[in-house]
Design a protein with these regions (language model features):
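Reductase modules of NAD(P)H-dependent flavoproteins
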Residues: 173-290
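A phosphate-binding catalytic loop at a beta-strand-loop-alpha-helix junction
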Residues: 141-157
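Ferredoxin-reductase
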Residues: 2-118, 177-178, 206-207
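A short, basic/flexible loop-to-alpha-helix module at the beginning of a structural domain
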Residues: 124-138
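Histidine-anchored nucleotide/phosphate-binding helix
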Residues: 77, 153-165
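Short, conserved phosphate/pyrophosphate- and ester-handling motifs at nucleotide-, phospho-/glycolipid
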Residues: 42, 150, 245
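Conserved S-adenosyl-L-methionine
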Residues: 139, 163-170
Length: 290
């Protein structure tokens, strides 16, 4: 893949399709006209909330309350560079009293009120969460560990590498609360069927009840150190990508003020497990959100 890319630029796009991936998650297929797109799997774009008339008063209120401008929001690309259309997948954020300082601004609009034909301006493309040439050259196996919408850049990276590079074997550990929360379930199954020797998925579900049919590919509970060592016993030639939730600045600040200790986050737990298994911290590529 060519590491050189164009400078970040603004593009006006049109929503060509809206695909429901999970109850609170949609993929927006974006038509860019004749604009040449130069990006890497794992990159993200940004969208400014100021361009949406429905948010005008809400943006003004939050800016007055915070005393600063509302920044653009970042969304990882679902699409890969070989595909005709650009795509992002948006999971609706929720306001949780005592946890989130302000109600989410843009994701509810994108996930619930975006229709075909709608136009918007995006800015892209950038981000460090990529399978670059150096990492690709030094690895034979790739372990991906993600949770929730952390699958979005992960999916882009995996499908592109499977299609255009024959060297690597990919293993994905993907954690969600319930089965219905799994994003890209059918797409991941199709990739497994198409590349049975190179791609394997293990799902972990943390909140399914006892009536759910768990098996070797659908496990109960959180990602554990034991599971990681089971699916990736040798890290000598393995690249590791981790994408999922971490503690927010607000959560850390609130806990400090109350003198409380935060429970380990998904990102914190997984990185700790990997380090205890002997993976150097600088060998772990990570991207977090919260």
């Amino acid at each position: 893949m060519n590491e050189k890319r164009e400078k970040i630029k603004e593009l006006e796009v049109m929503v060509a399709d809206v695909i429901q991936e999970a109850p609170d998650t949609v993929t927006l297929i974006l038509f860019t006209g004749n604009d040449k797109l130069n990006y890497e799997p794992g990159h993200f774009l940004t969208i400014s909330p100021h361009q949406f008339p429905a948010l005008e008063r809400w943006v003004s209120y939050l800016e007055d309350l915070k005393g600063k401008n509302e920044p653009p929001r970042a969304y990882s690309l679902t699409s890969s560079p070989d595909e005709k259309y650009l795509a992002i997948t948006v999971k609706e954020e929720r306001y949780i009293s005592g946890v989130t300082p302000f109600p989410p601004l843009l994701s509810p609009i994108l996930a619930r009120r975006t229709a075909r034909g709608q136009r918007m301006v995006i800015t892209g493309f950038t981000g460090p969460f990529t399978f670059n040439e150096e990492v690709r050259r030094e690895s034979e196996n790739v372990l991906h560990i993600c949770a929730g919408s952390g699958i979005v850049p992960t999916y882009s990276i995996i499908k592109y590498d499977l299609r255009y590079f024959s060297k690597h074997k990919h293993t994905l550990i993907y954690s969600n609360k319930n089965f219905e929360d799994i994003i890209f379930y059918s797409q991941l199954r199709k990739l497994e069927e198409e590349f049975p020797e190179r791609f394997k998925v293990i799902h972990t579900l943390t909140r399914e009840d006892g009536n759910f049919s768990f098996n070797g590919k659908m496990k109960r509970g959180r990602v554990s150190q034991e599971l990681i060592s089971e699916v990736a016993p040798d890290f000598k030639s393995t690249a590791v990508f981790v994408c999922g939730p971490d503690h927010t600045v607000h959560q850390r600040k609130t806990a400090k003020e109350k003198g409380e200790e935060l429970k380990p986050s998904f990102m914190g737990s997984v990185v700790t497990y990997l380090e205890e298994l002997g993976v150097p911290k600088n060998k772990i590529k990570r991207e977090s959100y919260g």
